[in-house]
């Protein structure tokens, strides 16, 4: 099992990172790496200056794989799943084989009901993705790729659904409907 913390970056030219702590459980020291891709092959390269003020971490390593507005991440077994809001995609990275695939892409989906992808969680292999805007839904992506609305909230301009989570026994879903400033 890979002992790493995976991080997204919420900018249009963002990267995908992994942090390998020197001592597992202590995040005060370790190595920050960025995903790179050349000729289809993925690799992890150490970021020279993890403080990353100038230049930012995403611009320090050649061939950094770009992700358009990284958002939520969740572990599904030993795989890492995350969303990118700029292109409405859901990604899945498998550390054991160092492979990456797109689980959902609104631009090519036969059922593009999910837009404004944001937070993601999972239960029993199903992915649950919150929409930041879109139709104000939490959308379920089943292991076979089927996409369907799981929750529909009433739409209020400027609102978003966020923070989807399940109770430890999986019988209750929780989420937050963030309202625009001034709404009650």
What function would you assign to each model-found segment?
Residues 1-184:
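Sequence/structural signature of beta-propeller domains
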